[in-house]
Amino acid sequence: RAFKEALPGVGHVFVFDTAFHQTLDRERYLYPLPLEYYTDYKIRKYGAHGTSHKYVSEQVIKELGNPKHSRIIVCHLGNGASLSAVLDGKCIDTSMGFTPLAGVMMGSRCGTIDPSIMPYLCKKLNKTPDEVLDIYNKKSGMLGISGISSDSRDIENALFNEGDERALLTGLLYSRIVSKYIGQYFVELGGLDAIAFTAGVGENAAYLRRLIIDDCSRALGVFLNEESNAIRSDENRLISHQFSKVDV
């Protein structure tokens, strides 16, 4: 409405961030709650970062030579982070859920954790559910574990220049959580042709990419070319080793 008032002669286009994830099957978007909660309140997985996942998966398909069949995992890793499993250009699963709080560990968001932690913290901290939810969203994730920052660059600096143990733990926990989703999506896709990293962390944090791929290497046969991984560039590039079974 504000833009229509400010720019009445300009066309307006709605781009829904969840649209790319509307191809999920019911068994992937439903939660194991009473089914009427879905029918009455529309509680289901919606996902996020859809525009990014769609664009990046399309670019990867081009890089693969436009095959008829493709199995791709897109890792959109920024301050907010999500993964998606893309089969033949269509999303079949994604890590964010009913809200963007779900899924992998993020800059200041905890991602998916045991739901029973909520009432426990309410009692221990004498806080309301909304106050604990604020902690989940704004004081957790990389920030909560490192005690330094929600920015991976600050954590990387503390790790390599100061040897900070919490910075090390943050990277290890982050990579382990992301690699779990990669393993899950490998199974759902029935194999894997490529893993794509995008967004601020995915494109720039070489050490986190290495930790993530190292976690997956034995199971998936995926390996990085260390020299290619270390290069910072705005261009799409292959950073996997020539003998890797999966392109990165």
Locate the predicted segments by residue.
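Catalytic phosphate/nucleotide-handling subdomain of diverse soluble enzymes
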Residues: L87, D93-T128, D134, A199-R232
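Beta-strand segments within the central parallel beta-sheet cores of soluble alpha/beta enzyme folds
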Residues: R71-C75, D130-K139, A194-A196
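Conserved phosphate-binding loops in N-terminal lobes of ATP-dependent enzymes
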Residues: R1-F14, T18
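Adenine-nucleotide phosphate-binding core of ATP-dependent small-molecule kinases
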Residues: D134, G141-I145, S152-E188
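Internal helix-turn-beta structural module
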Residues: L168, L172-L192, G202-V248
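Short glycine-rich phosphate-binding loop at a beta-alpha junction
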Residues: V10-V13, L189-G200
